[in-house]
From Swiss-Prot:
It comes from Pyrococcus abyssi (strain GE5 / Orsay). GO terms for biological process: phosphate-containing compound metabolic process. Gene3D superfamilies: Inorganic pyrophosphatase. It is found in: Cytoplasm. The keyword Hydrolase applies. Keywords: Cytoplasm, Hydrolase, Magnesium, Metal-binding. This is Inorganic pyrophosphatase. The keyword Transferase does not apply. Mg(2+) 2 binds at D71. It catalyses: diphosphate + H2O = 2 phosphate + H(+).
C-alpha cells in the first residue's frame, strides 16, 4: 500500500480531510513520504535549532504548485508519529513562497480532540501561535541560504478552495482513482 496514492483525501472533503503525518510536532528531523514507494525517508535534519511547532504532513491524493503533495499542519496538544492518519478540520491557509515557488499549507485541527471543537476558522487560533508558526517557516531554512517569503494567513474557506484545487491537480498529474 502506498498511502499517498491509496488513501482518500478525506472522509468529507473539504470539510474534513486526512492528514498523513510525516513530521511530528517537536521534531528537528524533516521526513518526506516517498511518492513512488510510500515509505518515509529522512530528507534532512534542520540546520537551525528550531523544531516543528505542529504535526506536519500531506493530504493524500493531492498535488500542489510546488510539485509536491499539498502540505497540511495539524495543531496537536501532543505529537503523534510519522505515518499517523488524522481526521482534520481545515481552519486556515498559510501562504508562503519557498525559493520562488508558491508553497501554501493548510492549517487544521484534529476532529477527534474535544479541545478544538470550537476552532472553525483562523480567527479562533491565538495570534501568538500563528506568529510562532510563521516565524518557524520564515527562518527554518535560513542557515541553508534559502529564502522564504511569508505572505500571511487566510481563513478556512480559502483553505477548502485550495484543497479542492489540489485534488484536481492530482487527478491531472496521476489520473483519477475513482
Amino acid at each position: 500500500m502506498n498511502p499517498f496514492h491509496d488513501l482518500e483525501p478525506g472522509p468529507n472533503v473539504p470539510e474534513v480531510v486526512y492528514a498523513l503525518i510525516e513530521i511530528p510536532k517537536g521534531s528537528r528531523n524533516k521526513y518526506e513520504l516517498d511518492k513512488k514507494t510510500g515509505l518515509l525517508k529522512l530528507d534532512r535534519v534542520l540546520y537551525s535549532p528550531f523544531f516543528y511547532p505542529v504535526d506536519y504532513g500531506i493530504i493524500p491524493r493531492t498535488w500542489y504548485d510546488d510539485d509536491d503533495p499539498f502540505d497540511i499542519m495539524v495543531i496537536m496538544r501532543e505529537p503523534t508519529y510519522p505515518l499517523t492518519i488524522i481526521e482534520a478540520r481545515p481552519i486556515g491557509l498559510f501562504k508562503m513562497i519557498d525559493s520562488g515557488d508558491k508553497d501554501y499549507k493548510v492549517l487544521a485541527v484534529p476532529v477527534e480532540d474535544p479541545y478544538f471543537k470550537d476552532w472553525k476558522d483562523i480567527d479562533d487560533v491565538p495570534k501568538a501561535f500563528l506568529d510562532e508558526i510563521a516565524h518557524f517557516f520564515k527562518r527554518y531554512k535560513e542557515l541553508q541560504g534559502k529564502e522564504i517569503i511569508v505572505e500571511g494567513w487566510e481563513g478556512a474557506e480559502a483553505a477548502k478552495r485550495e484543497i479542492l484545487r489540489a485534488i484536481e491537480l492530482y487527478k491531472e498529474k496521476f489520473g483519477s482513482k475513482e
